[in-house]
Amino acid sequence: MSRVPAHFLGRAVALGTIAGGVIAVDQWTKSWALHNLSSTSPRHILGPVYLVLSFNRGAAFSLGSGVSPVIEALASLLAVAVIAFSGRAARIGASPVVVVGLGLLSGGALSNLADRLFGDHHGAVVDFIQAVSWWPTFNVADAAITTGAVTVAVSLFFFSRPKAAHPDQR
């Protein structure tokens, strides 16, 4: 029986904890929004930020809202792909920054997918944050997905180290 490398366990636990935290916070804030917000009376928070209840049948930031069944299928595939990639990244020893980004991305994807599949909103995701008037409403999961994707991209682009050449290739 082979042992699981400690770096994999640590990264897997960190990734799972971050993803679980995102899911918990996102689902709690969506529940709060459903019980406390209206779609017709935005609640001013600070500066250009308002809270207003909306239901998004599209992808993040309401993209593709007219093709809900396609979005549901793509969201499901994307969530599975992100989780598979996250597991692989943890297994091969991805940097802690990449693990954090993947945890945010995984948690956001899974939470929005849970909304689509198990929520009472006919395949829609609950959105409630309006940062500026010209930008679509979003939720904590959307923010986590965006932050996670940017974190992973920046980390891989700016901080990834090239692999050392094999001695025979020098």
Describe the predicted segments one by one.
Residues 1-170:
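Alpha-helical transmembrane bundles and membrane-interface segments of multipass inner-membrane proteins
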